[in-house]
Each structure stands twice: as C-alpha cells, then as structure tokens.
Design a protein with these regions (language model features):
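N-terminal helix-turn-helix
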Residues: 1-74, 79-80, 238, 242-243
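Short, acidic, Ser/Thr-enriched surface-loop or helix-capping motifs
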Residues: 54, 102, 203-205
Length: 245
C-alpha cells in the first residue's frame, strides 16, 4: 500500500507543477529517496500516467490522467446540463461542438457532439488543449485576471503551427481584449490550415466562466453563414449558463 500511496502523492504533486519536475525535485517534495521516486515514475510512465520531456528530462502528467478526469466529469451537473443543448447546436450548424473546462491551470475537452468531420484536431474527450492557439483556451484567458493570463502565455511553448498562428504576447493580449468586447473567440486557420474554431463562455451563478462552448468548422469563406453559427453558439451557451445557475 505504501507504493500506491506514494504514486498517488506523486501524481498530486505533478498536478500542481504543470511545467514538470525532475526526479530530484519530486523526491524533495515527497520527502522520499530519489531512487524510490525514480521507480515510481518509471511505473507511472509505463502506464502512460506521466510523460518525460526528452530535453529537460522532467516529468509531468500524461494525457491518460486527463482522460480519467474527463470520465469523472462526465457525470457532473455541467456536462449533463450541456448535453442536450450541445446536440441541438451541432444539428443546427452541422458542425462538431465541444465543451471545455479549465481546472488546475489546464484546459481540456470534457464532452463532444460530433457532426461532419469527426477526425478534426483537438476534438477528443480528455484532450488537453493549448491556451494560446485554441478558441476555448483564449476565452478562458480573456475572462481571467490579465496578469494570470499573461503568466500562462509566458509558460506555454507558443509554436507557430501554421503561418497564421498568433504567438506574440502583444498581439495575443490585444486578441483577449477583442474577445471580451465581442463575447466570443475565433481561431482562423491558426491551429490547422483550412480549419476555423469559435468559442464563447458559459457563466456560473457568480458570473464567472464555468466552461467554454466551441465548434470547429472547415473554412468555406461564407461569412454570413459563419455569423449565423456564432449567434447560435452564443444562444446555446447562454441556455447552458441558465441551466447551471
């Protein structure tokens, strides 16, 4: 049982250190020998619960943990309240619709209603999404304290995945202002060429973002249709907000 307890403690510590920890750093926080820590991490890595950065050699939580967490969240009030609205929205706009949350500094998908191309990037439940280059990630940052948002951006490896990806702090800061002003975020071929993503916030009883409702779409150049989809997205996000208040 001691090994299990230590493994769970290791996962808990890593969940608070999203940039990862070395064997020595984790051993210090767990107050156990580095050799024991290494054995625990080797076991967790073998089960895909942690991953090791090839360059820094630091360990962080693996995506499998996020999938497990998503399974727990499925039964939550939020997901249950959103399910019907998500299905209706997906049918009306004929696009994939996803529900995202932010927990412990990580943004992830927790529910999805699929229409059209189900193989589209970042649609899988439990998938951790970047803040800087996704519509939902930017929505979360736009509605949090700006200092906190900038700290998140500074920690992220902001890679240009397409020529259109915004990576500069100044341009991303301006984008967050725009999102607050219009109430939604649009990613136009920034994550994948030919793909657009749109998200807007779902608010809890305190007026704080509880989640983000988003859809992805192949870019078709029809701006009028896109605006119709955005209006529907905002309407259904408000419907879900009302349901959880």
């Amino acid at each position: 049982m001691q090994l299990v307890d230590r493994a769970l403690s290791a996962l808990e510590v890593l969940s608070r250190n999203m940039d990862g920890l070395s064997v020595t750093e984790l051993a210090e926080q767990l107050d156990i020998p580095a050799s024991s820590t290494h054995r625990i991490l080797t076991s967790l890595k073998g089960n895909h619960l942690v991953v090791q950065d090839a360059q820094t050699k630091k360990y962080r939580l693996g995506y499998k943990i996020c999938g497990i967490a998503a399974g727990v969240v499925k039964g939550s009030v939020l997901t249950q309240a959103a399910q019907t609205s998500m299905q209706k929205l997906a049918e009306k706009i004929d696009r994939n619709v996803v529900l995202c949350i932010m927990e412990h500094g990580v943004a992830m998908n927790i529910a999805c209603s699929e229409r059209g191309d189900s193989n589209m990037y970042m649609m899988k439940i439990g998938h951790v999404i970047p803040f800087y280059s996704t519509s939902a990630g930017r929505v979360f940052m736009a509605y949090m304290d700006r200092k906190q948002a900038l700290e998140i951006l500074e920690k992220e490896t902001r890679t240009k995945t397409t020529p259109n990806t915004k990576t500069g702090l100044q341009e991303l800061n301006a984008e967050l202002d725009r999102i607050r002003a219009q109430g939604y975020s649009v990613i136009d071929e920034e994550l994948q060429l030919g793909i657009q993503g749109v998200a807007c916030p779902i608010f809890d009883i305190n007026g704080e973002p509880a989640a983000a409702l988003a859809f992805t779409s192949l870019k078709d150049g029809n701006e009028e249709e896109m605006q119709k989809r955005i209006r529907l997205l905002k309407a259904y996000a408000e419907e879900i907000s009302e349901a959880i208040r």
